[in-house]
Curated annotation (Swiss-Prot):
<dbReference type="InterPro" id="IPR011332">
    <property type="entry name" value="Ribosomal_zn-bd"/>
</dbReference>
<keyword id="KW-0687">Ribonucleoprotein</keyword>
<dbReference type="GO" id="GO:0003735">
    <property type="term" value="F:structural constituent of ribosome"/>
</dbReference>
<dbReference type="GO" id="GO:0005737">
    <property type="term" value="C:cytoplasm"/>
</dbReference>
<dbReference type="GO" id="GO:0005840">
    <property type="term" value="C:ribosome"/>
</dbReference>
<comment type="similarity">
    <text>Belongs to the bacterial ribosomal protein bL33 family.</text>
</comment>
<keyword id="KW-0689">Ribosomal protein</keyword>
<dbReference type="GO" id="GO:0006412">
    <property type="term" value="P:translation"/>
</dbReference>
<dbReference type="GO" id="GO:1990904">
    <property type="term" value="C:ribonucleoprotein complex"/>
</dbReference>
<dbReference type="InterPro" id="IPR038584">
    <property type="entry name" value="Ribosomal_bL33_sf"/>
</dbReference>
<dbReference type="InterPro" id="IPR018264">
    <property type="entry name" value="Ribosomal_bL33_CS"/>
</dbReference>
<dbReference type="Pfam" id="PF00471">
    <property type="entry name" value="Ribosomal_L33"/>
</dbReference>
<protein>
    <recommendedName>
        <fullName>Large ribosomal subunit protein bL33</fullName>
    </recommendedName>
</protein>
<dbReference type="InterPro" id="IPR001705">
    <property type="entry name" value="Ribosomal_bL33"/>
</dbReference>
Length: 49
């Protein structure tokens, strides 16, 4: 079952991206390097509740 998640920038805490993930295959919190338009650079984005 795929659920909707939100990715937040670790530097400025802005919630920039929405994505989907399969909780059965990926039970841990997702972390990705994505572009943050507020910081104007690539930063680590983590899954939020």
């Amino acid at each position: 079952m795929r659920t909707k998640i939100t990715l937040a920038c670790t530097e400025c805490k802005q919630r920039n991206y929405d994505s989907m993930k399969n909780k059965k295959n990926n039970p841990d919190r997702l972390e990705m390097n994505k572009y943050c338009r507020f910081c104007k650079k690539h930063t680590l984005h983590r899954e939020t509740k």
